[in-house]
Amino acid sequence: MQPLLLLLAFLLPTGAEAGEIIGGRESRPHSRPYMAYLQIQSPAGQSRCGGFLVREDFVLTAAHCWGSNINVTLGAHNIQRRENTQQHITARRAIRHPQYNQRTIQNDIMLLQLSRRVRRNRNVNPVALPRAQEGLRPGTLCTVAGWGRVSMRRGTDTLREVQLRVQRDRQCLRIFGSYDPRRQICVGDRRERKAAFKGDSGGPLLCNNVAHGIVSYGKSSGVPPEVFTRVSSFLPWIRTTMRSFKLLDQMETPL
């Protein structure tokens, strides 16, 4: 089955439909201070994704959310309002995992280095990451949040969230031929009408207040289960990348 990337393109073809968090609810304003809203410019046009703050100068998201120009909004609840909690920062660098495969959507993870550090407060604050190779048991209840649209004609401007359960790997293996249990997580009970959908790509899967996953892809119908990038499998790359670019910037600083 051809997987559906869950980013939301602004320039959609006639008849295409984009969706929001399915079966969810509006989040309590500013209760998720790590959430990032990404406005992306690429050769294919404009799109938007989610992401999450992992350090004062880095946001983690999906590699398929790459663009030549990315504007990041943090501290937002309603993305169409000028909230005094919001911080708008451009991405200095978009660093995709070197083994990201656009065809199979393997290693769908990317770091955005911000052009300046965020001002940390109760509305903007990094989220905790898991330990290396830390797993999740099937049945674990987690939460996904995002700003995906409802339809072509009506959208949601406020952050929404939904609770989803981790599934056994075989649920995704039977649907998605390229699913890799070592680097991906199968999420969402097919018996429930709850899921992430277009526009939610790059957002975090929070389990016990730890960002274990990144929204990656699912079926075009929006019916679960869906595939999330397993953050714990990429911790060495995340840490090495953030450290190396910090050192590079120090070397480039003029005397």
From Swiss-Prot:
CDD domains reported in the protein's UniProt record:
Tryp_SPc
- Source domain of life: Eukaryota
Q: Which GO terms describe its cellular component?
A: azurophil granule lumen; collagen-containing extracellular matrix; cytoplasmic stress granule; cytosol; extracellular exosome; extracellular region; extracellular space; lysosome
Q: Name one Pfam family in it.
A: Trypsin
Region listing for Important for antimicrobial activity, in residue ranges: 21-25, 97-111
Which PROSITE patterns does the entry mention? TRYPSIN_DOM (PS50240), TRYPSIN_HIS (PS00134), TRYPSIN_SER (PS00135)
Briefly describe its induction. Induced by the Td92 surface protein of the periodontal pathogen T.denticola. Down-regulated in monocytes following M.tuberculosis infection and exposure to bacterial lipopolysaccharide which coincides with increased M.tuberculosis replication and intracellular survival.
UniProt membrane topology term: Peripheral membrane protein
Write out the annotated subcellular location.
Cell membrane; Cytoplasmic granule; Secreted; Cytoplasm, Cytosol
Q: Which residues form the propeptide?
A: 19-20, 245-255
Give the protein's biological function.
Answer: Serine protease with trypsin- and chymotrypsin-like specificity. Also displays antibacterial activity against Gram-negative and Gram-positive bacteria independent of its protease activity. Prefers Phe and Tyr residues in the P1 position of substrates but also cleaves efficiently after Trp and Leu. Shows a preference for negatively charged amino acids in the P2' position and for aliphatic amino acids both upstream and downstream of the cleavage site. Required for recruitment and activation of platelets which is mediated by the F2RL3/PAR4 platelet receptor.
Quaternary structure and partners = (Microbial infection) Interacts with CASP4; the interaction is promoted by the Td92 surface protein of the periodontal pathogen T.denticola and leads to CASP4 activation.
Protein name, entry field = Cathepsin G
The root-end lineage is: Eukaryota, Metazoa, Chordata, Craniata, Vertebrata
